[in-house]
């Protein structure tokens, strides 16, 4: 596990304190938000990994002070994250004709209903930030979508 520098720890603390502010300024963050905090810090852990290091399934089950958050974050830094090939393989499942396209509606369904479920608002934001273009039949080229999502962060539009 890589050792974090003091500057990195300070950055973690800043983001942690922002979530603490939203949670009531009690010096802790709800463990339900552990994955969200980590995603804001640039890692994309799977939910099962978040649960393994102390994340919870429901709000209010447990709070994490920074002293407990830090080792959880460090543990998640080393967890496997999805690769471009993984995402392409997943989208191919929905590409019935093997042409590299899926419908925009199906993309929305995949993102909101399967795996790491996103809210409709999150999907709207992703589509906006990636400047996702549908063809005349309402299909999107999923390779372009995956590349744009994985390239983040996005400039202000």
Swiss-Prot record:
Swiss-Prot/TrEMBL keywords = Motor protein, Muscle protein, Myosin, Repeat
Question: What is a single molecular function from GO for this protein?
Answer: calcium ion binding
Q: Does the keyword Ribosomal protein apply?
A: no
Cite the EF-hand domain residue spans from the record.
7-44, 82-117
Give the CDD domains listed for this entry. EFh
Cite a GO CC annotation. muscle myosin complex
Q: Name one Pfam family in it.
A: EF-hand_7
Function description: In molluscan muscle, calcium regulation is associated with myosin rather than with actin. Muscle myosin contains two types of light chains: the catalytic light chain, essential for ATPase activity, and the regulatory light chain, a calcium-binding protein responsible for Ca(2+) dependent binding and Ca(2+) dependent Mg-ATPase activity.
Q: What is this protein called?
A: Myosin essential light chain, striated adductor muscle
Please name the source species: Argopecten irradians (Bay scallop)
